[in-house]
Structures are given as structure tokens and as C-alpha cells.
Amino acid sequence: MSGIQPVPGAKPLSMWQQYGPSEKTVRGIVIGGITGGIEICITFPTEYVKTQLQLDERSATPKFRGPIDCVKQTVNGHGFFGLYRGLSVLLYGSIPKSSFRFGTFEYLKSQAADERGNLSPVMRLLCGLGAGLSEAVFAVTPMETVKVKFIHDQGLAQPKYKGFVHGVGCIVKAEGLGGIYKGVTATMAKQGSNQAIRFFVMETLKDWYRGGDNTQPISKPIVGLMGAVAGAASVYGNTPIDVVKTRMQGLEAKKYKNTLDCAMQIWKKEGFFAFYKGTVPRLSRVCLDVGITFMIYDSIIEFLDVYWKKQQ
């Protein structure tokens, strides 16, 4: 329930106004979805390289010598757009993921903010955590599982997936619906910690920059810089979780009993630094990703605020 109460003598509130989500929550859902679609089209190549490196397990003859070599081999073998293989799968997931993330955060923030619209440090962390868990369960886990399997499949000599629908059908047929929820525990841990760190850092930097005055504007380059800092903090905070999640969602996930077993096998067979495999491409991707995401999100909100005020 939105908590909106009718004013005596005023026009009766509709069912949507009384029981539906608040305006900020709806804006978070819609604008978040638009933001997610734009952002993933810009940053996908680094996501592709990161995933390829994490799936390239240590062996006597590793396929890639690093991120640059991965890019070279991909472009030489498939052309420039080879770096965009699997984009459609991630695009299908990025829009709902971003919608759940920002919609949930805006809802939780509206419930936890003080009279000036600011969050306490603990609430920043908890609202970010809630946003991450929401996107993990409802969007990230199924779509990331499909994405990782697609990218892994495209690296094989004879790919078996002919397209998004065919690929999902093959996965469900072979593994059941549970096949697209492989690694859900690791994904919840990853997304929860990711967004807890990012929103905490972002809201803290914004509050510091504004001096506690929530009405003060922040230029878009500064928002982008804050987003990059928040992204970098999340990378160093949870890359090990990301590595385990990727292994659990790959085509060879069946060799692991569960998330803990996957982590133990990586530790025993590959050592501590295997948990930070793919950090360089992930760092560049995430800093760019988070910076762009918050810039786009804030820009669309400002644009719509001006438009809506003109309509009133």
C-alpha cells in the first residue's frame, strides 16, 4: 500500500493511487529498464572478454594468454562483431535486471529516507542489498545462466545453440527449469554485495558532495566519476564471488556439487589468485558500466521531471 491518504473535498483516489506502487517506484522501474538497455549495448565487449577468461580454466595449453589476446583471437576468428556474440541474451536480461534494481531501491529508499530524502549509512547499505537481491532472484540468475552457457557454447568448435529460444529450450530440456537457476546462491551473494557496495558508495558520495542538501544538483561528469568509484569498490569487494558464480553457470557446472564445492575445488586445484581471474577486464567494464548507468539514469530522471512539470 502506497500510504497515500485522501484529502477532504478532493477528487477520490483511484485504486492504483491507493494500492499501487509510488510514483518514484514506477519511475525507477521504467527508467531503470531504459538505462539497462542503453548501458549494455555500450559495455558488452568487455563483458564478453571477462566471461571468456573466467571460463578458460587453467590447463596445460590455455586458450588465451590474457584479455588482449582474447580480443585478438575473437576478432581474427569472427570479426569485430564477434565481441558482440551473445548480446541479445544479455540485452533480454539487462532491461528487467535494471528495472528490478532501481525500482526496488527507489521503493526501499522512499520507506527509509528521512524528511529531507536522505538515507543513513546503514539504510544505504540495506537498500542497496535489497535491490541486489531483488534483481538476482527475478532477473539475473536465469538470464546470466543462459548468457554464460551461450558464450561458452560459441567458443566451441561446433556450437549447439542456434539462437536464444533454441538455446533456452535445450537447457531446459537437458536440465529442467532448475537448469536456468544454477548458482542462484552465488548470484544472490554477488548481486546483493554488488549493489550494497555501489549504492552505499554512490549515496555517500552524493551526500558528501551536496553537503547534506538533497536538492543540490550534481553535474553528469561528477555523477559518472562517482559511479566509477562505486564500481571499482564493488569489483575488489566481490570478484571471488563472481568467479564462482560464472563457473556454476558454465556448461561444466555439473562437476560441482554446489556453490561451496565449486569454491573449494577452485582453491585446491588453482590457488587463491584464481578467484581474481578476469579482474582487469571486469574492472574496466564495471567502472564504465556503473558510471554510465548512473549518468543515464540521472539524466533521464531530470529530463522527465522537466517534462512532467510542463504538463502540470
From Swiss-Prot:
Any one biological process term the GO annotation gives: mitochondrial citrate transmembrane transport
Membrane topology: Multi-pass membrane protein
Keywords per UniProt: Membrane, Mitochondrion, Mitochondrion inner membrane, Repeat, Transit peptide, Transmembrane, Transmembrane helix, Transport
Pfam families: Mito_carr
Protein's UniProt keywords contain Transmembrane: yes
Subcellular location: Mitochondrion inner membrane
Molecular-function GO terms, alphabetical: citrate secondary active transmembrane transporter activity
Solcar repeats: 23-111, 122-208, 218-303
Main location: mitochondrion
A GO cellular component entry from the record: mitochondrial inner membrane
PANTHER family: SUCCINATE/FUMARATE MITOCHONDRIAL TRANSPORTER-RELATED, TRICARBOXYLATE TRANSPORT PROTEIN, MITOCHONDRIAL
Role this protein plays: Transport of citrate across inner mitochondrial membrane.
Protein name: Putative tricarboxylate transport protein, mitochondrial
